[in-house]
Protein backbone atom coordinates (compact mmCIF):
# COMPACT_ATOMS: atom_id res chain seq x y z
CA UNK A 1 0.00 0.00 0.00
CA UNK A 2 2.81 2.42 -0.86
CA UNK A 3 3.13 4.78 -3.82
CA UNK A 4 6.42 5.48 -5.62
CA UNK A 5 6.67 7.88 -8.56
CA UNK A 6 9.98 8.37 -10.34
CA UNK A 7 11.05 10.30 -13.42
CA UNK A 8 14.69 10.52 -12.28
CA UNK A 9 15.82 8.09 -9.59
CA UNK A 10 14.75 6.65 -6.25
CA UNK A 11 17.58 4.77 -4.54
CA UNK A 12 16.69 2.57 -1.56
CA UNK A 13 19.48 0.90 0.43
CA UNK A 14 19.60 -2.43 2.25
CA UNK A 15 17.50 -3.21 5.33
CA UNK A 16 15.08 -0.34 4.73
CA UNK A 17 11.55 -0.61 6.14
CA UNK A 18 8.94 1.36 4.20
CA UNK A 19 5.63 0.93 6.01
CA UNK A 20 2.03 1.25 4.84
CA UNK A 21 0.66 4.23 2.94
CA UNK A 22 4.04 5.87 2.37
CA UNK A 23 4.49 8.09 -0.69
CA UNK A 24 7.94 8.56 -2.26
CA UNK A 25 8.28 11.05 -5.15
CA UNK A 26 11.18 12.44 -7.14
CA UNK A 27 8.97 14.67 -9.29
CA UNK A 28 6.21 17.26 -9.39
CA UNK A 29 3.52 18.15 -11.93
CA UNK A 30 5.27 21.26 -13.22
CA UNK A 31 4.37 24.84 -12.35
CA UNK A 32 0.99 26.25 -11.38
CA UNK A 33 -0.16 28.82 -13.91
CA UNK A 34 -3.11 31.19 -13.59
CA UNK A 35 -4.71 30.02 -16.82
CA UNK A 36 -4.96 26.47 -15.43
CA UNK A 37 -6.74 27.40 -12.20
CA UNK A 38 -10.44 26.78 -11.79
CA UNK A 39 -12.61 27.42 -8.77
CA UNK A 40 -15.27 25.23 -7.28
CA UNK A 41 -18.69 26.60 -8.25
CA UNK A 42 -20.71 24.29 -6.00
CA UNK A 43 -22.05 26.38 -3.08
CA UNK A 44 -22.30 23.25 -0.89
CA UNK A 45 -18.54 22.70 -1.04
CA UNK A 46 -16.01 25.06 0.61
CA UNK A 47 -14.13 27.38 -1.74
CA UNK A 48 -11.08 25.48 -2.85
CA UNK A 49 -9.26 25.81 -6.09
CA UNK A 50 -9.03 22.84 -8.38
CA UNK A 51 -5.83 22.37 -10.32
CA UNK A 52 -5.92 20.49 -13.56
CA UNK A 53 -2.76 18.44 -13.55
CA UNK A 54 -3.48 16.06 -16.39
CA UNK A 55 -2.01 18.43 -18.99
CA UNK A 56 1.10 19.27 -16.98
CA UNK A 57 4.06 16.91 -17.49
CA UNK A 58 5.99 15.45 -14.58
CA UNK A 59 9.23 17.31 -13.86
CA UNK A 60 12.13 15.87 -11.87
CA UNK A 61 13.21 17.80 -8.79
CA UNK A 62 16.20 15.58 -8.03
CA UNK A 63 16.63 11.97 -6.93
CA UNK A 64 15.52 10.51 -3.62
CA UNK A 65 18.22 8.61 -1.72
CA UNK A 66 17.34 6.42 1.25
CA UNK A 67 20.49 4.92 2.75
CA UNK A 68 20.85 1.57 4.57
CA UNK A 69 18.94 0.61 7.73
CA UNK A 70 16.29 3.34 7.59
CA UNK A 71 12.79 2.92 9.04
CA UNK A 72 9.99 4.98 7.50
CA UNK A 73 6.77 5.05 9.53
CA UNK A 74 3.21 4.83 8.23
CA UNK A 75 1.62 7.61 6.15
CA UNK A 76 4.92 9.40 5.45
CA UNK A 77 5.65 11.49 2.37
CA UNK A 78 9.21 11.64 1.02
CA UNK A 79 9.57 14.59 -1.36
CA UNK A 80 11.88 15.11 -4.36
CA UNK A 81 15.55 15.81 -3.63
CA UNK A 82 15.47 14.16 -0.20
CA UNK A 83 18.42 12.20 1.18
CA UNK A 84 17.86 10.14 4.33
CA UNK A 85 21.07 9.09 6.10
CA UNK A 86 21.69 5.54 7.26
CA UNK A 87 20.19 4.25 10.52
CA UNK A 88 17.60 7.05 10.60
CA UNK A 89 13.99 6.78 11.71
CA UNK A 90 11.17 8.75 10.10
CA UNK A 91 8.17 9.01 12.46
CA UNK A 92 4.67 8.23 11.17
CA UNK A 93 2.86 11.00 9.26
CA UNK A 94 6.11 12.93 8.62
CA UNK A 95 6.77 14.92 5.45
CA UNK A 96 10.47 14.87 4.55
CA UNK A 97 11.84 17.28 1.96
CA UNK A 98 15.51 17.81 2.80
CA UNK A 99 18.73 16.05 3.76
CA UNK A 100 18.48 14.04 7.00
CA UNK A 101 21.82 13.15 8.64
CA UNK A 102 22.61 9.55 9.64
CA UNK A 103 21.40 8.32 13.05
CA UNK A 104 18.53 10.82 13.22
CA UNK A 105 14.96 10.53 14.44
CA UNK A 106 12.74 13.01 12.59
CA UNK A 107 9.06 13.84 12.92
CA UNK A 108 6.50 16.36 11.75
CA UNK A 109 5.41 18.35 8.74
CA UNK A 110 7.89 19.53 7.74
CA UNK A 111 10.04 16.86 9.36
CA UNK A 112 12.42 18.18 12.02
CA UNK A 113 15.21 16.36 13.83
CA UNK A 114 13.94 15.23 17.24
CA UNK A 115 17.13 13.49 18.34
CA UNK A 116 20.43 12.33 16.89
CA UNK A 117 21.81 9.16 18.37
CA UNK A 118 25.27 7.54 18.15
CA UNK A 119 26.33 4.23 16.67
CA UNK A 120 26.33 2.60 20.11
CA UNK A 121 22.71 3.62 20.69
CA UNK A 122 21.22 2.79 17.30
CA UNK A 123 18.64 0.39 18.73
CA UNK A 124 16.06 3.09 19.59
PLM regions and their residue ranges:
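C-terminal/domain-terminus segments
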Residues: 72-112, 120-124
Amino acid sequence: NCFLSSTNKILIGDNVAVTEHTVILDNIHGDFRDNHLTFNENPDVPDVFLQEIKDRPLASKGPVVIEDSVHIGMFCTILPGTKIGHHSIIAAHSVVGRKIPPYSLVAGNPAQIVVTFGKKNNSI
